Amino acid sequence: MASTDSVYRPTPTPDHDTTVVVVVFVSLGCVMFLAFLAFVIWFLIKKRSRKHRERSEAVRVDEHFKMKEAIVEGPNGQKSVVLSVEDDVKIEDAIKREEKDLKKDGGVGSSVVSRS
């Protein structure tokens, strides 16, 4: 009988190739996901800042003073001066925005600017 040491056995192929492929694809997938996430965050920040830029505020303040002077007699016959001051302040905030309306022209990419 022949010993088992004398039998030619082929050496097994290394399984490192599949491990490397899996590690590379998982790493690239994570990098692509992080790049996509960074792009989405950048887009949202850009959209929010553009929304703030389009809005312009106009504040109108009307202020009126009314003074009344009256001379009245006191209980002992003394004359005294009474001043009454009325301060009337009106503040109006007019916010103007550029709004895009696709319904009027019907075309894609067309915009109509309306100010209110």
From Swiss-Prot:
The chain crosses the membrane at residues 25-45. GO terms for cellular component: extracellular region; plant-type cell wall; plasma membrane; secondary cell wall cellulose synthase complex. Expressed preferentially in differentiating vessel elements in seedlings. Its main location: membrane. It is found in: Cell membrane; Secreted, Cell wall. GO terms for biological process: cell wall organization; plant-type secondary cell wall biogenesis; regulation of secondary cell wall biogenesis; tracheary element differentiation. Residues 46-116 are cytoplasmic. Keywords: Cell membrane, Cell wall, Cell wall biogenesis/degradation, Developmental protein, Membrane, Secreted, Transmembrane, Transmembrane helix. It is a single-pass membrane protein. Residues 1-24 are extracellular. Disruption phenotype: Conditional double mutant plants lacking both TED6 and TED7 have aberrant secondary cell wall (SCW) formation of root vessel elements. Interacts with CESA7/IRX3, a subunit of the secondary cell wall (SCW)-related cellulose synthase complex. Involved in the secondary cell wall (SCW) formation of vessel elements (e.g. protoxylem and metaxylem), thus promoting tracheary element (TE) differentiation. This is Protein TRACHEARY ELEMENT DIFFERENTIATION-RELATED 6. The lineage of its organism: Eukaryota, Viridiplantae, Streptophyta, Embryophyta, Tracheophyta.
